[in-house]
């Protein structure tokens, strides 16, 4: 194995950047060339079919089978112009990845010959095996039927020679088995709730759209080094490895010069993104060595989420071409920053108003404050649901590690905006407001744009920060599907806005004027949500103590955090807003707990194998060298001198023996703990057992191995070390 390590280093030293050439010097010449967007639809579809598609996208109007046939035929004609041979229904099962089954256009004609055909029926629906994907017990193996159904709001696209049709994935009995179905429901729920609130201010607003701008962080590692680390290959992270003498402490990687091989990879990634209509805009070095980021311009949430799933697939495929492997695990290396996926979330009206941006007048600012304050209340009431949406076996290693937001949910507004909310509380009383009081309050509200111009600072330790015209949810992990957090946030926001509107309307029914009713409920909401507002250092111990005093939860136990998917508040949101039914919600919990269990189980097995079959033999081989050295010393030197000269080696032999014995004992104990957990029939008990009885062994075993790495001869150490993984370019 040590030979493989040095062979990998030798191979890496001979790598050269690949030459990458864009199809044209003008981006607009090829942007969206592989997407069946509206421009292509106009070209390839009859007028009635084009109108039917646009009505379906904008108004939700159903598409008839006859029209579907016309659309399918036009889509096939366009795809054939790109040399496409197959089509697939592209969907997002509960695996945190995507799935696809490729079918050819080939069919037998009436004369027995072969023809190419793609019908509306094939476009609209297919039947993959639902029992082979995570389903939380909804589908048994003998109940395999599931359906994929075309999501007309997300355009079809071409990858290589395959036409990909974005779809939802449901069971034969109608339960959602994917991320897209509940995401679309959550977006519809917040659209309706937000529109109803907007109409208190402006009757011209008839729709509210959710926008998402994600920031994808990732690590790159040379494929030779990757293949020489079985833990990276099988788990996505290093289960062992002593910290490099130099890592990120000099802060010289962030925004630094991008290495040539990485630049070539990034260029090709951007070209492929742009062909697929993904508006990739920003690329840069991140904080940790060999860590990078890609960020696009924000888009409609559903499309943005599809694009993020596409980007993660593209990264893996293109990286291999450049002799890299992409690491999307949240914490592939201990001791340096992990990777997140910031979700920049905003709500915009069909009249062009960003509801999280201050208006141009007091009325516009009242609308802004209404949505700002309700967002705060949403986070406060649903902190456990938001945490559950981002909690996983991998993300837990990142949260609160002085690099990412803590597991405590809080909101950062900036001191000036917080003061504005406090001023509203001070000025709004319980009695009827005088015209003068209303004028004073509205004048104060009118100053908000000036306040935000210079004083909306950025607090990198805040999990849910207001950044001037959006909220940035920073707790989501780099490998996650954005839909998980977007479902939680949008469903919870819909629930909160519905409550707000009902409270305002109740006061209006009692004879209170509309403006005053809004101010009174805003005041109540500001006071109630005050514990969630925090401007300080989210990494500090003082904040943990203060958060506890405020009643904010801090759950770092993964299964315990996930169990909050089915607490009363989460049910009132997810079931109450009709995002899930009871069966679907329970199945989601089961899937997440089973995923957690399996990931820890795999890590335990891989670490046990590497420890016993790679590390222990290497340590014993080195120990034997030392013993041979001692025998040689004893033959040459007198007894008294021998004792002095051999003391350090004897101590090292003793240390290695202690470490080897400890590793063997701990691996044996971990294996027994896994066996006990595996025999538990209840998936909840099994997950808790893996969290409490199995996972702690991973760090204990690692500690002994990392010490051995610093004691054993570098020439025989079998696995690439951190300095090689992180600093070889």
Residue ranges of each PLM-predicted region?
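Short linear, low-complexity motifs centered on an aromatic residue
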Residues: 96-112, 131, 229, 236-238, ...
């Amino acid at each position: 194995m040590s030979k493989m390590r040095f062979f990998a280093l030798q191979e890496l030293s001979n790598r050269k950047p690949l030459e990458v050439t864009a199809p044209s010097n003008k981006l607009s010449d090829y942007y969206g060339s592989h997407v069946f967007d509206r421009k292509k639809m106009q070209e390839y579809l009859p007028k009635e079919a084009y109108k039917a598609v646009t009505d379906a996208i904008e108004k939700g109007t159903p598409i008839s089978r006859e029209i579907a046939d016309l659309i399918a035929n036009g889509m096939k004609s366009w795809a054939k112009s790109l040399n496409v041979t197959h089509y697939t229904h592209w969907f997002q099962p509960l695996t945190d990845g995507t799935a696809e089954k490729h079918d050819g256009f080939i069919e037998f004609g009436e004369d027995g010959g072969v023809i190419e055909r793609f019908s509306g029926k094939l476009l609209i629906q297919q039947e993959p095996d639902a029992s082979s994907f995570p389903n939380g017990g909804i589908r048994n193996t003998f109940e395999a039927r599931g359906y994929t159904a075309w999501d007309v709001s997300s355009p079809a696209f071409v990858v290589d020679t395959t036409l990909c049709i974005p779809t939802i994935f449901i069971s034969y009995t109608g339960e959602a088995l994917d991320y897209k179905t509940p995401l679309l429901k959550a977006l519809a729920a917040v659209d309706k709730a937000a529109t109803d609130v907007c109409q208190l201010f402006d009757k011209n607003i008839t729709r509210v759209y959710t926008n998402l701008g994600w920031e994808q962080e990732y690590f790159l590692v040379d494929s030779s080094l990757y293949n020489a680390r079985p833990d990276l290959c099988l788990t996505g992270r290093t289960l062992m490895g002593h910290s490099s003498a130099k890592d990120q402490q000099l802060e010289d990687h962030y925004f630094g010069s991008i290495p040539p091989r990485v630049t070539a990879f990034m260029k090709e990634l951007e070209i492929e993104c742009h062909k697929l209509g993904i508006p990739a805009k920003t690329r840069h070095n991140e904080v940790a060595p060999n860590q990078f980021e890609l960020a696009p311009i924000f888009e409609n949430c559903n499309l943005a989420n599809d694009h993020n799933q596409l980007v993660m697939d593209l990264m893996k495929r293109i990286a291999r071409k450049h002799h890299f492997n992409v690491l999307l695990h949240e914490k592939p290396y201990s001791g340096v920053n992990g990777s997140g996926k910031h979700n920049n979330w905003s709500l915009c009206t069909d009249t062009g108003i960003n509801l999280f941006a201050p208006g141009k007048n007091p009325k516009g600012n009242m609308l802004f404050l209404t949505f700002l304050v309700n967002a705060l209340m949403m986070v406060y009431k649903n902190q456990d649901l938001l945490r559950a949406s981002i909690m996983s076996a991998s993300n837990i290693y990142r949260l609160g590690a002085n690099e990412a937001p803590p597991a405590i949910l809080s909101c950062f507004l900036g001191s000036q905006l917080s003061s504005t909310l406090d001023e509203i509380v001070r000025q709004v009383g319980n009695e009827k407001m005088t015209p003068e009081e209303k004028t004073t309050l509205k004048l104060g509200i009118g100053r908000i744009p000036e306040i935000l111009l210079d004083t909306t600072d950025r607090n990198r330790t805040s999990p849910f920060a207001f950044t001037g015209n959006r909220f940035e949810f920073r707790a989501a992990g780099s490998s996650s599907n954005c839909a998980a957090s977007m479902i939680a946030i949008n469903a919870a926001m819909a629930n909160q806005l519905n409550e707000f509107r009902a409270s305002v309307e109740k006061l209006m029914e009692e004879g209170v004027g509309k403006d005053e009713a809004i101010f009174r409920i805003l005041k109540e909401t500001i006071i109630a949500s005050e514990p969630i507002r925090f401007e300080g250092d989210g990494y500090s111990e003082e904040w943990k103590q203060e958060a506890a005093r405020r009643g904010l939860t801090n759950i770092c136990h993964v299964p315990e955090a996930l169990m909050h998917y089915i607490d009363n508040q989460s049910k009132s949101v997810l079931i109450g807003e009709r995002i899930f039914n009871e069966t679907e919600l329970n199945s989601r919990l089961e899937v997440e707990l089973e995923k957690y269990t399996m990931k820890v189980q795999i890590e335990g097995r891989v670490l046990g194998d590497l420890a016993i079959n790679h590390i222990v033999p290497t340590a014993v081989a080195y120990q034997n060298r030392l013993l041979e050295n001692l025998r040689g010393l004893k033959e040459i030197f007198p007894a008294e001198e021998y004792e002095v000269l051999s003391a350090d080696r004897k101590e090292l032999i003793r240390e290695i023996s202690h470490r080897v014995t400890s590793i063997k004992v701990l691996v044996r104990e971990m294996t027994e703990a896994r066996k006990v957990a595996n025999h538990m029939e209840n998936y909840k008990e099994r997950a808790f057992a893996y969290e409490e009885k199995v996972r702690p062994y991973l760090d204990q075993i690692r500690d002994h191995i990392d010490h051995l790495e610093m004691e054993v001869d570098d020439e025989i150490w079998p696995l690439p070390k951190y300095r090689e993984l992180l600093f070889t370019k």
